[in-house]
């Protein structure tokens, strides 16, 4: 069985103390790295579990803290307030995400020239925004992410983009899916959208229904299929 190391990484953004989690295979090798951007609830065992799965597939992973160390384990209403705060200034959010990319690239266990990002729900929007920033990143994957554009001057998208979407997600209606497709086409980037029928928001989270939000529920088949496609995507990026 592959050894797995897990370490907290302290960093800052505009004076805010953040604490991301680096999950690696325990060796001294610099491997392709995947930044995992969590849901509105911030860094949890769910994302750390996803990171451990990535290590098993030959990647090291940084579970990104974008909300701040003081919000770890905070109540749902508090976290939704923080999500709204960050989402209200997409230019600042972009800079926050670019700072996380810099942190990831600064880890000796991650090959700074081979980095991808993936995100869930609000984190999916963040992953897309990282691509939209024109960052020098290999690819991004959005899982049940939000597609609304940032309203910032467009940059040349260097990353390959894949979005895994539940067709019945009430937060992302079909016109938003079409709008993302048009946006990515106009940006001339390499993009994919995978839509899963009978699937809502939060479909990768076995505890999604605990949020008690209409249209938010776990779908095992979509979770399995999307992660299988993710690994094909990462293999295409990094070989």
Regions found by a protein language model. Give the residues of each.
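N-terminal cap/leader regions of alpha/beta-hydrolase-fold enzymes
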Residues: 1-239
């Amino acid at each position: 069985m592959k050894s797995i190391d897990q370490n907290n990484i302290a960093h800052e953004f505009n004076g805010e103390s953040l604490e991301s989690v680096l999950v690696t295979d325990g060796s001294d090798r610099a491997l392709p790295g995947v930044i995992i951007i969590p849901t509105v609830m911030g860094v949890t065992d769910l994302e750390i579990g996803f990171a451990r799965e990535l290590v098993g597939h030959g990647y090291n992973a940084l579970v990104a803290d974008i909300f701040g160390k003081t919000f770890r384990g905070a109540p749902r209403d508090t976290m939704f307030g923080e999500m709204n705060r960050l989402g209200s200034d997409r230019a600042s959010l972009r800079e926050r995400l670019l700072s996380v990319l810099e942190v990831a690239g600064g880890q000796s266990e991650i090959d700074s020239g081979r980095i991808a990002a993936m995100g869930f729900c609000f984190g999916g929007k963040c992953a897309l925004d990282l691509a939209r920033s024109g960052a020098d990143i290999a690819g991004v994957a959005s899982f049940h992410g939000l597609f609304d554009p940032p309203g910032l001057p467009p940059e040349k998208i260097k990353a390959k983009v894949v979005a895994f979407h539940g067709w019945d997600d009430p937060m992302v209606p079909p016109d938003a899916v079409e709008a993302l497709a048009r946006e990515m086409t106009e940006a001339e980037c390499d993009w994919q959208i995978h839509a899963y029928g009978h699937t809502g928001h939060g479909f990768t989270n076995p505890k999604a229904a605990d949020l008690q939000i209409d249209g938010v529920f776990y779908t095992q088949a979509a979770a399995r299929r999307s992660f299988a496609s993710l690994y094909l995507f990462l293999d295409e990026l990094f070989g």
